């Protein structure tokens, strides 16, 4: 039904906004890879690829894709992000990792990480140590050697209620917690 689809779209939008508010930097346009067509010596810009959220912790950059997927409820691998999303994250990561301007901005020791953030209910899932964030695995491709961190997209579940309770933009403790989990 289209009513159910509209509700889902609204919830997906709210999920993306909550993730961006808690973890993301405000001005992320710099991090959007751009493309263009050249036709008859005239450049025609395409719309940018736009990652949901860019998180910074120390000198590292984390490209976060908020996925309002039901894996956190079902545990079914069919409910995880597909190849198009995985490949897009790798593209974002490669762009940030290889563009000189980002090394200038974040330093030579900058590392780039990728993660999908999906909702779950920590009370229903009986998490060890009552964790509000849980790493469930990582997605990789067969067209990269997966030697770079950004080529391995981490699958992270985030407790919906605890995320909703955070009213601070760029909450530093949550950012550090998520950064550690992604890197682990």
Please give the residue ranges for each predicted region.
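Nucleic-acid nuclease catalytic cores
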Residues: 39-41, 62, 67-68, 77-83, ...
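Polybasic (Lys/Arg-rich)
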Residues: 117-184
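Secondary-structure boundary elements
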Residues: 21-33, 56-60, 98-102
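Short amphipathic alpha-helical face segments that pack within enzyme cores
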Residues: 18, 22, 87-94
């Amino acid at each position: 039904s289209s009513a159910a689809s509209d509700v889902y779209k609204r919830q997906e939008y709210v999920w993306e906004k909550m993730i961006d508010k808690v973890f993301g930097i405000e001005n992320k346009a710099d991090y959007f890879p751009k493309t263009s067509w050249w036709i008859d010596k005239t450049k025609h810009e395409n719309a940018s690829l736009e990652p949901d959220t860019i998180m910074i912790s120390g000198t590292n950059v984390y490209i976060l894709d908020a996925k309002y997927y039901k894996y956190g409820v079902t545990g079914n691998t069919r409910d995880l992000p597909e190849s198009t999303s995985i490949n897009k994250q790798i593209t974002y990561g490669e762009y940030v990792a290889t563009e000189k301007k980002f090394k200038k901005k974040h330093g030579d020791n900058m590392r780039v990480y990728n993660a999908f953030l999906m909702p779950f209910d920590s009370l229903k899932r009986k998490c060890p140590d009552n964790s509000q964030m849980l790493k469930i695995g990582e997605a990789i491709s067969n067209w990269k050697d997966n030697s770079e961190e950004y080529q391995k997209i981490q699958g992270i579940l985030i407790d919906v209620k605890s995320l909703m309770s955070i009213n601070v933009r760029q909450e530093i403790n949550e950012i550090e917690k998520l950064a550690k989990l992604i890197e682990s």
